[in-house]
UniProtKB/Swiss-Prot annotation:
Pfam families: Homeodomain (PF00046), OAR (PF03826)
One cellular component (GO) term of this entry: nucleus
Source species: Mus musculus (Mouse)
DNA-binding region listed in the record: 140-199
Gene (UniProt): Shox2
PANTHER family listed in its UniProt record: SHORT STATURE HOMEOBOX, SHORT STATURE HOMEOBOX PROTEIN 2
Name this polypeptide is given: Short stature homeobox protein 2
């Protein structure tokens, strides 16, 4: 017990010495508010959380010394406790302001009210970037160029001369028409695409029309040839024998295939041998052969006339379409 009392008294003596070395409340009042703001050791001893460790130790020692003064050995502690109590008794507004300034200057790592967290900064930067992207997308919208009639005429005239004008021609035309070279280049690209599309449509239309004329010739040898007769031949050849009818059908198919082979698309030449029938057998009467050849000639003539009429009509249709297109363009 005596050892414990000696240890406590020794610790109290050390704390009293530290307190004497610290700045007292009276010295702070005499020195003014500036000294209290500059020196961190001038804070109030009675505060627990916001005071320095040395001052907290001095205040605690004074309180403990005041409580154990009856045990003998805490006289200095009692005096320190009284000083601490007197120091913590009265507070002035100036003192509180000085303590707030000292705390802000003493704790540089504490968060300030003016500082912004990094997450909030990142969010603001992301929102700003999204707004900038939206503005750039709106600005990148292309505006359609409205060409005048004179500009279209000049462009069409140069397109008739060449479909691929060089840079010098485009620059000269752009200066003459008051357009940019990029606009002229884009117009020629669109015009070439439109021209290719029209050519493909016309080519497909001609092929479909020509193939529909000779659709009856594209049959296999085992198909019933009786169904391939022309309507105008049914009444005139009712009294023909079955053998002569077979010969006539063979001649008709041979002539039609030969005509299609020479005038239709070249890729049908490979299929022509499969369309032909074997030659008529020998030993038939000459009158029958002559009648069959005459009927075959009439069939060939009718097919040629139908082809010529269809060709003329297709050319007329193309010319009419060209006139309509020119009228639509305002040429």
């Amino acid at each position: 017990m005596e050892e414990l009392t000696a240890f406590v008294s020794k610790s109290f003596d050390q704390k009293v010495k530290e307190k004497k070395e610290a700045i007292t409340y009276r010295e702070v009042l005499e020195s003014g508010p500036l000294r209290g703001a500059k020196e961190p050791g001038c804070v109030e001893p009675g505060r627990d959380d916001r005071s320095s460790p040395a001052v907290r130790a001095a205040g605690g020692g004074g309180g403990a010394g005041g409580g154990g003064g009856g045990g003998g050995g805490g006289g200095g502690g009692a005096g320190g406790g009284g000083a601490g109590g007197g120091a913590g008794g009265g507070r002035s507004p100036v003192r509180e302001l000085d303590m707030g300034a000292a705390e802000r200057s003493r704790e540089p790592g504490s968060p300030r009210l003016t500082e912004v967290s990094p997450e909030l900064k990142d969010r603001k930067d992301d929102a700003k970037g999204m707004e900038d992207e939206g503005q750039t997308k709106i600005k990148q919208r292309r505006s359609r160029t409205n060409f005048t009639l004179e500009q279209l005429n000049e462009l069409e005239r140069l397109f008739d001369e060449t479909h691929y004008p060089d840079a010098f021609m485009r620059e000269e035309l752009s200066q003459r028409l008051g357009l940019s070279e990029a606009r002229v280049q884009v117009w020629f690209q669109n015009r070439r695409a439109k021209c290719r599309k029209q050519e493909n449509q016309l080519h497909k239309g001609v092929l479909i029309g020509a193939a529909s004329q000779f659709e009856a010739c594209r049959v296999a040898p085992y198909v019933n040839v009786g169904a391939l007769r022309m309507p105008f031949q049914q009444d005139s050849h009712c009294n023909v024998t079955p053998l002569s009818f077979q010969v006539q059908a063979q001649l008709q198919l041979d002539s039609a295939v030969a005509h299609a082979h020479h005038h239709l698309h070249p890729h049908l030449a490979a299929h022509a041998p499969y369309m032909m029938f074997p030659a008529p057998p020998f030993g038939l009467p000459l009158a029958t052969l002559a009648a069959d050849s005459a009927s075959a000639a009439s069939v060939v003539a009718a097919a040629a006339a139908a082809k010529t009429t269809s060709k003329n009509s297709s050319i007329a249709d193309l010319r009419l379409k060209a006139k309509k297109h020119a009228a639509a363009l305002g040429l």
